[in-house]
């Protein structure tokens, strides 16, 4: 069955300035800054939380539909995803706005000047999940990823109304949402995904206790960076899964999206919680070792070897068997 992934679709435009921003800023003129930097290069990466997760699920062989909003400039990105098995028929194309874009220039001190253009993402609120269900049938799971906040609320309510299982994954939007808004996204979720900082932020903003949250969801999935991930059930049963050791640390961007995609692909394929988290941890480390969130490569034999090294031959055999 299909996993429907809702959330942001974006492109990242990254540049490098071979000097120091600090040397160009004159204290006496900070009230009227007007600067232009000649950069060395420009690298464009495909991204957005929904784009990243849909890409990874497709690469792993899962059935996935991308549900989000993009601009007319989405054509190349669409072809890229379709080549990986992603159903892009439910991407709303804006008639007026470009695809969301993150632009960032980094200097030699790793200082950054960045901007984010939400663009077409603001139109995601116009997407109806009922239309997706009519076209592809009832999805196995709907991921409610970081997106236009109003779209997140509407998608969540529609999942409840239509009886669709959903995963709450507010991630970076937790910082801007109020406690009341966060509460609207949680109740009834099959999965609640956060990292450890976001979990504490969620509790702080909502005023809920852990018990309050666990009474409303089926499973809490909290990633812990280099310490792995905790899977917590309502009765307190906890499974901890460690990371797959990395060969290098290139860029952490998109690691959380990768884990979620691997974990949910495993669940969809019939794996248990622990094995699914182990698969998610492998996909996460592949992204960590790559430049760009969708530039990693999937190699069946290499995956089996790394899983065996991290979790043992038996675990590796169980995981790769469902991906064959």
Swiss-Prot record:
Assembly and oligomerization: Homodimer.
EC category name: transferase
Keywords: Acetylation, ATP-binding, Kinase, Magnesium, Nucleotide-binding, Purine salvage, Transferase
Function: Catalyzes the phosphorylation of adenosine to adenosine monophosphate (AMP). Can also catalyze the phosphorylation of the adenosine analog 2-methyladenosine (methyl-Ado) to methyl-AMP, the first step in the metabolism of this compound to an active form that displays antitubercular activity. Is not active on guanosine, inosine, deoxyadenosine, cytidine, uridine, or thymidine. Prefers dGTP and GTP to ATP as phosphate donors in vitro.
Needed co-factor(s): Mg(2+)
Annotated ATP binding sites: 195, 223-228, 256
Lineage: Bacteria, Bacillati, Actinomycetota, Actinomycetes, Mycobacteriales
Pathway: Purine metabolism; AMP biosynthesis via salvage pathway; AMP from adenosine: step 1/1
Organism domain of life: Bacteria
Entry's Gene Ontology molecular function annotations: adenosine kinase activity; ATP binding; dGTP binding; GTP binding; magnesium ion binding
InterPro entries from the UniProt entry: Carboh/pur_kinase_PfkB_CS (IPR002173), PfkB_Carbo_kinase (IPR050306), PfkB_dom (IPR011611), Ribokinase-like (IPR029056)
Example of a GO cellular component annotation carried by this entry: plasma membrane
Gene3D superfamilies attached to this UniProt entry: 3.40.1190.20
Protein name in the entry: Adenosine kinase
The keyword Protein transport belongs to this UniProt entry's keyword annotation: no
E.C. number: 2.7.1.20
Residue numbers annotated as active site: 257
Record's catalysed reaction(s): adenosine + ATP = AMP + ADP + H(+); adenosine + GTP = GDP + AMP + H(+); dGTP + adenosine = dGDP + AMP + H(+)
Binding positions for substrate per the UniProt entry: 8, 12, 36, 48, 52, 102, 116, 172-173, 257
Extra information: Was identified as a high-confidence drug target.
GO BP: any one term: purine ribonucleoside salvage
């Amino acid at each position: 069955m299909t996993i429907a992934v809702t959330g942001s679709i974006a492109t990242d435009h990254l540049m490098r300035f071979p000097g120091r921003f600090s040397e160009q800023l004159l204290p006496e003129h900070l009230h009227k800054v007007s600067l232009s930097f000649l950069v060395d290069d420009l690298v464009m990466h495909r991204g957005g939380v929904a784009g990243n997760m849909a890409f990874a699920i497709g690469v792993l062989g899962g059935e996935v539909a991308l549900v989000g909003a993009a601009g007319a400039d989405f054509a190349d990105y669409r072809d890229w995803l379709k080549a990986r098995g992603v159903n892009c028929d439910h991407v709303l194309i804006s008639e007026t706005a470009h695809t969301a874009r993150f632009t960032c220039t980094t200097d030699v001190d790793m200082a950054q000047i960045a901007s984010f253009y939400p663009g077409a993402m603001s139109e995601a609120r116009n997407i109806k999940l009922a239309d997706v269900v009519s076209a592809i049938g009832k999805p196995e799971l709907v991921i409610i990823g970081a997106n236009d906040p109003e779209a997140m609320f509407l998608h969540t309510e529609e999942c409840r109304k239509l009886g669709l299982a959903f995963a709450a994954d507010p991630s970076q939007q937790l910082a801007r949402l109020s406690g009341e808004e966060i509460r609207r996204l949680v109740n009834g979720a099959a999965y609640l995904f956060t990292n450890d900082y976001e979990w504490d932020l969620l509790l702080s903003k909502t005023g809920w206790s852990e018990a309050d949250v666990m009474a409303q969801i089926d499973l809490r999935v909290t990633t812990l960076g280099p310490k792995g991930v905790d899977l917590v059930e309502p009765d307190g049963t906890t499974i901890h899964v460690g990371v797959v050791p990395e060969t290098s640390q290139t860029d952490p961007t998109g690691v959380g999206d990768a884990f979620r995609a691997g974990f949910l692909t495993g669940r969809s394929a019939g794996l248990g919680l622990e094995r699914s988290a182990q698969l998610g941890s492998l996909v996460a480390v592949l992204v960590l070792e790559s430049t760009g969130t969708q530039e990693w490569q999937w190699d069946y034999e290499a995956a089996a070897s790394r899983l065996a090294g991290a979790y043992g031959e038996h675990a590796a055999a169980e995981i790769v068997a469902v991906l064959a």
